[in-house]
Amino acid sequence: MRTLARFTLFLVAAALVLDAGAAAAEQWGGIEPGETTMAVVKSLRGTPTRTAKQKVDGYDTEEWVYEDAKAPAGIRRLTVDFGLVTPSGYRPDLVRSLKLDPKPGAFDKESITTGWGAPAGVGKDGEVDFFFYKEGLFVYFAKDGHGVATMTFTPPQPPPPGTPLPR
């Protein structure tokens, strides 16, 4: 998990330095990575089920998790990570990423492409297929290849190295 957090922090920092806000980030439920603050998340979602503070690449970060009754409809768990390096410096109160763990059947490949269009890239992580959107959305599918396992929203980013682009 720590490696994923570092990788995400690195990608977000690289995207902000290279692309300094040229594309809008994908948002979900009023939460937009790179724009929304802790105070706004709390006003939208209320008090989280649990929180955790951690250090990522020397920065103090925080994670808020909304589960069960506190999670949005159709979602098992909503995880919001705070702490983002921006062109003007580190912002500990800014949303770095937003991760949705949907309930089975809530999303599938068809609903993803209907809602977000064709992905900028597709790939495989072990046995798991994923879609990448340059606006900052990563969609990982269940091992059956159809249902959605997780959706992670980040600020806009370049495709991961080696990600094939759709034809």
What residues fall within each predicted segment?
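Cleaved targeting-peptide boundary
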Residues: 23-35
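A general structural-boundary detector
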Residues: 12, 27-28, 99
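Structural signature of transmembrane alpha-helix termini at the membrane-water interface
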Residues: 18-21, 52
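Bacterial N-terminal signal peptides
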Residues: 8-19
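A cross-family detector of function-defining hotspots
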Residues: 36-167
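Positively charged n-region of N-terminal signal peptides that target proteins for export
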Residues: 1-6
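Short N-terminal micro-motifs specific to bacterial/archaeal maturation
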Residues: 16, 31-32, 103
